Amino acid sequence: MISSSAVYPEYGDQPFREDSERALNRYWGSYGTDKIAAEDALLDRVSDAYILRPPYIYGPMNNVYREAFVFDCARADRPFYLPGDGGMKLQFFHVKDLCILMERVIEEKLETHIMNVGNVEPVTIKDWVTMCYACFDKIPAFVNVSE
């Protein structure tokens, strides 16, 4: 099953461990709690099922207007509205890497059945946006926004 790191509450220590508390995440809401319910339902039926919990997935065929939004802001020389001080950490995982891992799980019947997957190092929102703007040789002008 492809689940999500949205099963972890926003206040949990990062990086999340597979045995970390799963609970409502105020940013993800029912998406995360529905993933928890799906995981539980699967494990009730198939106790040795595999569950992969990726963070933000990026790459070809991405239908989420996330990376493209930041690139569009950079192209248009728009300032970027940064939540808080931009220190919140994000973690990404390329769709090709997810496919490689899924293939390995299927072929090798790995011993670990629940896995958080993603790039080893998280990145702050501010650093991520800065890297995206740098793809266009630009430096973002940030506007800090509080909740």
Language-model segment annotations:
Residues 2-5, 52-54:
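SDR active-site strand-loop-helix element
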Residues 5-29:
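Active-site "gating" loop of Rossmann-like NAD(P)-dependent oxidoreductase/epimerase domains
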Residues 7, 57, 98:
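Conserved sequence/active-site signature of Rossmann-fold short-chain dehydrogenase/reductase
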Residues 21, 71-83, 138-143:
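A short C-terminal helix-loop "cap" of Rossmann-like NAD(P)-dependent dehydrogenase/epimerase domains
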Residues 25-51, 66:
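Active-site Tyr-X1-5-Lys
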Residues 52-69:
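Flexible, glycine-rich beta-alpha linker
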Residues 64-70, 83-106, 113:
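Substrate-positioning beta->alpha
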Residues 104-147:
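Mid/C-terminal beta-alpha module of Rossmann-like enzyme folds, strongest
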